[in-house]
Swiss-Prot record:
GO molecular function terms noted in the UniProt entry: small ribosomal subunit rRNA binding; structural constituent of ribosome
Gene field: rpsT
Keywords per UniProt: Ribonucleoprotein, Ribosomal protein, RNA-binding, rRNA-binding
InterPro entries recorded: Ribosomal_bS20, Ribosomal_bS20_sf
GO biological process: translation
Domain of life: Bacteria
Name used for this protein in its record: Small ribosomal subunit protein bS20
Family listed: Belongs to the bacterial ribosomal protein bS20 family.
GO cellular component: cytosol; small ribosomal subunit
Annotated region (Disordered), positions in chain: 1-25
SUPFAM superfamilies in the cross-refs: Ribosomal protein S20
Its biological purpose: Binds directly to 16S ribosomal RNA.
Pfam families on file: Ribosomal_S20p
Protein backbone atom coordinates (compact mmCIF):
# COMPACT_ATOMS: atom_id res chain seq x y z
CA UNK A 1 0.00 0.00 0.00
CA UNK A 2 1.28 3.44 -0.85
CA UNK A 3 1.92 6.15 1.71
CA UNK A 4 1.44 9.12 -0.58
CA UNK A 5 -2.11 10.42 -0.77
CA UNK A 6 -1.94 11.43 -4.43
CA UNK A 7 -0.67 7.97 -5.39
CA UNK A 8 -3.54 6.36 -3.48
CA UNK A 9 -5.96 8.47 -5.50
CA UNK A 10 -4.18 7.55 -8.76
CA UNK A 11 -4.51 3.87 -7.81
CA UNK A 12 -8.25 4.28 -7.31
CA UNK A 13 -8.60 6.24 -10.56
CA UNK A 14 -6.54 3.70 -12.51
CA UNK A 15 -8.65 0.83 -11.18
CA UNK A 16 -11.87 2.56 -12.28
CA UNK A 17 -10.39 3.22 -15.72
CA UNK A 18 -9.16 -0.38 -16.00
CA UNK A 19 -12.63 -1.75 -15.28
CA UNK A 20 -14.23 0.69 -17.72
CA UNK A 21 -11.72 -0.18 -20.45
CA UNK A 22 -12.20 -3.89 -19.80
CA UNK A 23 -15.95 -3.51 -20.30
CA UNK A 24 -15.55 -1.52 -23.52
CA UNK A 25 -13.04 -3.99 -24.96
CA UNK A 26 -15.33 -6.88 -24.09
CA UNK A 27 -18.25 -5.26 -25.92
CA UNK A 28 -15.96 -4.60 -28.91
CA UNK A 29 -14.97 -8.27 -29.06
CA UNK A 30 -18.63 -9.28 -28.84
CA UNK A 31 -19.58 -6.90 -31.67
CA UNK A 32 -16.76 -8.14 -33.91
CA UNK A 33 -17.66 -11.75 -33.16
CA UNK A 34 -21.33 -11.14 -34.07
CA UNK A 35 -20.25 -9.49 -37.34
CA UNK A 36 -17.95 -12.39 -38.24
CA UNK A 37 -20.69 -14.93 -37.47
CA UNK A 38 -23.10 -13.07 -39.76
CA UNK A 39 -20.49 -13.03 -42.53
CA UNK A 40 -19.75 -16.72 -42.02
CA UNK A 41 -23.48 -17.49 -42.28
CA UNK A 42 -23.67 -15.46 -45.51
CA UNK A 43 -26.20 -12.95 -44.16
CA UNK A 44 -25.05 -9.87 -46.06
CA UNK A 45 -27.79 -7.46 -44.89
CA UNK A 46 -27.33 -8.37 -41.24
CA UNK A 47 -23.55 -8.15 -41.60
CA UNK A 48 -23.84 -4.69 -43.18
CA UNK A 49 -25.91 -3.43 -40.23
CA UNK A 50 -23.49 -5.00 -37.77
CA UNK A 51 -20.55 -3.41 -39.59
CA UNK A 52 -22.04 0.05 -39.05
CA UNK A 53 -22.64 -0.54 -35.34
CA UNK A 54 -19.25 -2.17 -34.85
CA UNK A 55 -17.49 0.69 -36.63
CA UNK A 56 -19.29 3.15 -34.39
CA UNK A 57 -18.18 1.25 -31.28
CA UNK A 58 -14.60 1.14 -32.54
CA UNK A 59 -14.61 4.89 -33.21
CA UNK A 60 -16.06 5.60 -29.80
CA UNK A 61 -13.46 3.41 -28.08
CA UNK A 62 -10.69 5.17 -30.01
CA UNK A 63 -11.99 8.62 -29.10
CA UNK A 64 -12.19 7.64 -25.42
CA UNK A 65 -8.60 6.37 -25.52
CA UNK A 66 -9.46 2.73 -24.88
CA UNK A 67 -7.76 1.66 -28.11
CA UNK A 68 -5.45 3.53 -30.46
CA UNK A 69 -7.08 5.31 -33.40
CA UNK A 70 -4.94 3.39 -35.90
CA UNK A 71 -6.02 0.09 -34.36
CA UNK A 72 -9.64 1.13 -34.77
CA UNK A 73 -9.00 2.14 -38.39
CA UNK A 74 -7.25 -1.16 -39.15
CA UNK A 75 -10.07 -3.21 -37.61
CA UNK A 76 -12.75 -1.23 -39.49
CA UNK A 77 -10.86 -1.66 -42.75
CA UNK A 78 -10.43 -5.40 -42.24
CA UNK A 79 -14.12 -5.85 -41.38
CA UNK A 80 -15.18 -3.85 -44.44
CA UNK A 81 -12.94 -5.98 -46.67
CA UNK A 82 -14.50 -9.10 -45.18
CA UNK A 83 -17.98 -7.79 -45.95
CA UNK A 84 -17.04 -6.82 -49.51
CA UNK A 85 -15.84 -10.37 -50.21
CA UNK A 86 -19.43 -11.63 -49.80
Amino acid sequence: MTNIKSQQKRNRTNERARLRNKSVKSSLRTAVRAFREAVHAGEKEKAAKLLVSTSRKLDKAASKGVIHKNQAANKKSALARTLNKL
